[in-house]
């Protein structure tokens, strides 16, 4: 995975994430939209044969786009850990 900044501003960030596809793009977009202060989050896959996505984040200024992305990843990690615990508890039944 390689991340390149395409555009950056106080409330806007556009990243190219090489080596990733719809799975990561959709996951990040969904969790970004749960972060307070995020006004807009989207991703696109410019070409179907190239493993690369473009992620766009816009905030209202109460949080930076980079902070919002980190928070979104932390939220995804928390939910993943909860899911792991649920799966483990199923095995014990």
UniProtKB/Swiss-Prot annotation:
Subcellular compartments: Cytoplasm
A Pfam short name: RNA_pol_L_2
Keywords, in A-Z order: Cytoplasm, DNA-directed RNA polymerase, Nucleotidyltransferase, Transcription, Transferase
Taxonomic superkingdom: Archaea
Family annotation (PROSITE patterns): RNA_POL_L_13KD (PS01154)
Main location as per UniProt: cytoplasm
HAMAP family per UniProt: RNApol_arch_Rpo11
This protein's name: DNA-directed RNA polymerase subunit Rpo11
The species this protein was found in: Sulfurisphaera tokodaii (strain DSM 16993 / JCM 10545 / NBRC 100140 / 7) (Sulfolobus tokodaii)
């Amino acid at each position: 995975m390689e991340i390149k900044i395409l555009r950056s501003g106080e409330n806007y960030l556009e990243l190219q994430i090489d080596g990733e596809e719809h799975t990561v793009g959709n996951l990040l977009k969904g969790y970004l939209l749960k972060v307070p202060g995020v006004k807009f989050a989207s991703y696109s896959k410019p070409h179907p044969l190239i493993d690369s996505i473009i992620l766009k984040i816009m905030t209202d200024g109460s949080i930076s786009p980079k902070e919002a992305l980190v928070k979104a990843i932390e939220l995804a990690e928390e939910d993943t850990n909860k899911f792991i615990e649920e799966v483990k508890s199923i095995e014990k039944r």
